[in-house]
């Protein structure tokens, strides 16, 4: 490669020759690195209300932020803080997870209060479930009066016996059937030859 005439030093494209600075072995140049976490930001007065990231009253303008967040609830922040840089969401009640709802959103309490009443609960109609009268008990049978749903319904005895004879159900077992003997009433039933066990009612 031939150099142009008049050029004594072969330095290309604006390169400057390196200056050799003599460095002694005892003197080394030490530079302290800049820790960004130690730098202070503009301060908490930048925004109207301090953030709740990391811990309560955390300075959001600091460069270093903690790795966790305490969810402190500021109910007045969403109403008063109109200059906050964070997003503010106003949810439309008609939007559901399936899209825009076409029907009006009515609370369930209003649905229940507007339900039509059954015909037997209207005024002037007879009540189906009537309370059974209290029966006097002997001192040996004294117990607290327990009213069940079966006792509150007054069924005619004829209808109950007709159902038991039609279904082949035997009357309530006596003490002899509980002890292992078959009652005479059960032998008269057409279902007496079945292998069903006798249950006490």
Swiss-Prot record:
Q: Where is there biased composition of kind Polar residues?
A: 191-201
Repeat STPGR: residue ranges?
171-186
Stretch list, region Disordered: 172-201
Which region is the signal sequence?
none
Top-level taxon of origin: Eukaryota
Q: What cellular component GO annotations does this protein have?
A: cytoskeleton
By sequence similarity, the record places it as follows: Belongs to the CIMAP family.
Protein name as catalogued: Protein CIMAP1C
Organism in which the protein naturally occurs? Bos taurus
């Amino acid at each position: 490669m031939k150099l142009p005439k008049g050029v004594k030093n072969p330095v290309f494209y604006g390169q400057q020759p390196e200056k050799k600075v003599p460095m002694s072995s005892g003197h080394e140049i030490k530079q302290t690195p800049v820790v960004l976490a130690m730098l202070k930001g503009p301060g908490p007065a930048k925004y109207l209300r301090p953030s709740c990231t990391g811990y309560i009253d955390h300075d959001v303008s600091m460069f270093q932020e903690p790795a966790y967040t305490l969810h402190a609830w500021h109910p007045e922040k969403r109403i008063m803080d109109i200059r906050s840089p964070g997003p503010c969401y106003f949810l439309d009640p008609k939007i559901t997870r399936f899209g825009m709802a076409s029907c009006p959103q009515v609370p369930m309490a209003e649905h229940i209060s507007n339900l039509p009443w059954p015909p037997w609960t209207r005024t002037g109609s007879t009540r189906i479930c009537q309370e059974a009268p209290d029966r006097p008990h002997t001192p040996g049978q004294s117990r607290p009066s327990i009213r069940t749903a079966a006792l509150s319904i007054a069924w005619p005895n004829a209808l109950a016996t007709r159902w038991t004879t039609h279904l082949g159900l035997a009357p309530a077992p006596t003490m002899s059937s509980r002890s292992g003997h078959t009652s005479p009433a059960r032998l008269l039933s057409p279902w007496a030859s079945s292998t069903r066990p006798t249950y006490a009612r």
